[in-house]
């Protein structure tokens, strides 16, 4: 819910935002991709974000949504049964799947780089403590 609130605020205030999807159970950092939230697949965390933005915040149902996302279409690797982990809570956290630092770090670095690129290539004006794009400039 916090991610949804942040994304809704960023969209309403025309502040660039890069969101990061689920890394739990992923092993291949090189499989990471960056796309608009509307184009993301194979990521339940970002699917939930997309659903909540559309249902509760009036986000576009067709075309781009304006939130860039770092994600992976790699299938989640289930935990090794010999580890004896309880994975029954059904939540979207890494519990039971674990995470690989190479994947989480790559996601974070990609998000930071994407946001820096967006800020450098967007004519932003600081207004009232928040960055806003000029009225004649398309948002991401």
Where are the model-predicted features located?
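ADP-ribose/adenylate-binding Rossmann-like module
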Residues: 1-35
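Glycine-rich phosphate/adenylate-binding loop
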Residues: 17, 27, 39-140
């Amino acid at each position: 819910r916090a991610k949804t609130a942040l994304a809704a605020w960023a969209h309403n205030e025309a502040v660039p935002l890069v969101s990061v999807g689920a890394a739990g159970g992923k092993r291949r950092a090189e499989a990471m991709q960056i796309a608009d939230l509307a184009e993301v697949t194979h990521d339940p965390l970002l699917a939930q974000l997309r659903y909540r933005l559309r249902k509760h915040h009036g986000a576009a149902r067709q075309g781009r949504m304006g939130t860039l996302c770092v994600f992976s279409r790699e299938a989640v690797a289930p935990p090794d049964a010999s580890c004896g982990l309880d994975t029954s809570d059904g939540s979207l956290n890494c519990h039971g799947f674990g995470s690989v630092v190479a994947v989480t770090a790559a996601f974070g670095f990609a998000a930071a780089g994407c946001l820096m690129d967006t800020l450098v290539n967007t004519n932003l004006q600081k207004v009232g403590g928040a960055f806003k794009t000029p009225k004649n400039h398309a948002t991401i």
